[in-house]
């Protein structure tokens, strides 16, 4: 659990502390299968999505300190482990998590003229439309995960436990990435 204590969840936002505590509490239970077995099961679900040439384009789009591909994969992996532990729909969780940020632009510099609201409000719908265009029909749970992962910005809360799980994991992973993205800048200023 010491590795999880190093994750920078020192946020005043209560749900991040709760997620950290929950993950730290459940981590030993998540290791009931070997890492190799879990990875094999995860990639059996994930490969049809991540091997798609359109999906591979996400590797070139920056997201905090990484790229969208790596961010989505991190969210999907952690969500997969927690979904297994809580008996949730693993396939829906993995696919929904992989597709939750399925847009092809750098949100810091690009503004879509079709959307009035800022990226945080509009990209769930953009991601859903892209997912349907590339992968076809999605399950109701997958759709809910994608469209509502920015809750409470999306106003309507997630309908399924799977959606809420991915929403919370996404916030934790994105917070960690954002924190890591600014840390090198802080180190540079301290050294001067």
PLM feature spans:
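Metal-dependent phosphohydrolase cores
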Residues: 1-192
